[in-house]
Each structure stands twice: as C-alpha cells, then as structure tokens.
C-alpha cells in the first residue's frame, strides 16, 4: 500500500485498479465513506470538483456499498483484498501500480524501494531476493515486517503480552497495517481502535 500511496502523492492520481485496491484498504482500516471521499478529493488536486464528482465519486461510494444494486448495498460493498488475491491477479500494465510489489516489481527495483524505506540489513535483503525468486512473496513481506518492527516484537514476546496467534504470518494488507499500528503504539491504551478485523476482510 505504501507503493500506491507514494504513486498517488507523486502523480496526484491512480488508475482504476490502484484506486480500487487502495480504497478498499482504507475502508478496511476503518475510514468512513465521507473521510474516504475527502481523502481522494484532496489527493486528486489537479482536477476540478466537477470532474471528480462525475468520474470518481460514484466508484468510491459503490466500493462502500452506498450505491449500486441491492446485493451491493446489503453486503456493504466490496471487501479489502487479501495478499492471495493480490498475488494471483493479472499483472499491472503500463502506468498502473496496483498489486503486490513483491510480485510486480523487478527484484532490483524492489530492493531499492525497501532500502529507501529503511531496510538496510544485507542478510535480510538477500533473503528477500531468494524469497521472491521462489515466488514466496508473503514470506518476503513478513520478513520486512519482522525487520522493521523487531524491537516491538521482541518486547511483546518478552512480556508475553501477545500470543503466538497475534504474531502469525500476515496474509492480508489490513492485518499488516493493524499489527504495525498496534506495535508502534504499545502501551498507549488505545491500540485496539483500528477497524477492519479479519472477519471484515476478503480471504
């Protein structure tokens, strides 16, 4: 999702499948429809309100189940995409940025991206290369998560405050976000406020 966010910030735009993936992710974090509409309107700062309302607003509302057929409204729209869905979807075409970067990026570009985000350990980067080569994308992603949260993970393990299930392999972008948020806010007393639990996610 960080890749989609960076693309959005750089270009003030995402193509359809990138918008769909990111909108559903934001929905899974607990962002309301109104908040999501504001987010996209502010992000698409190079277009007019009229163009945004005509070309983009309806799709966002549809993703949330606010419009569309009865089944869509009853089901409250679409569920956030799981890792499995993202790595089995067709690869993005030119100008598109959706999907799982562990699968869609050339390995050297992926490593460069990870280095820019603070993954500096050569052994970790080497292991990620091997994981990607073997198409073990979720393992590579979890390796990055463990590296970037190693202090917090060590703390909850030592304290016994998290069960083994709480640290299971991550197989959903919203789980990645939620677990990261909770680890980074340990001891703040409100670490459970992030929405989008596993029951709300697409397997």
How would you describe each model-predicted region?
Residues 1-20, 24, 28-203:
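Basic, alpha-helical nucleic-acid-binding regions used in initiation and control of genome expression
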């Amino acid at each position: 999702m960080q890749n989609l966010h960076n693309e959005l910030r750089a270009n003030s735009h995402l193509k359809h499948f990138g918008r769909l993936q990111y909108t559903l992710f934001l929905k899974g974090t607990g962002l309301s429809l109104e908040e999501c509409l504001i987010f996209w309107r502010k992000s698409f700062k190079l277009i007019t309100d009229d163009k945004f309302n005509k070309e983009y607003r309806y799709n966002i509302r549809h993703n949330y189940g606010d419009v569309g057929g009865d089944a869509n409204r009853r089901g409250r729209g679409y569920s956030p995409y799981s890792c499995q869905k993202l790595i089995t979807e067709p690869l993005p075409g030119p100008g598109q940025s959706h999907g799982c970067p562990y699968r869609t990026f050339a390995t050297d570009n992926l490593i460069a991206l990870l280095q820019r985000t603070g993954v500096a350990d050569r052994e970790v980067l080497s292991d990620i290369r091997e994981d990607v080569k073997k198409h073990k994308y979720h393992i590579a992603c979890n390796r990055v998560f463990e590296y970037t949260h190693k202090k917090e993970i060590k703390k909850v393990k030592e304290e016994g405050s998290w069960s083994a299930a709480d640290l299971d392999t991550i197989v959903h972008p919203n789980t990645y976000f939620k677990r990261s948020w909770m680890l980074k806010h340990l001891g703040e007393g409100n670490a459970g406020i992030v929405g989008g639990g596993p029951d709300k996610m697409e397997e």
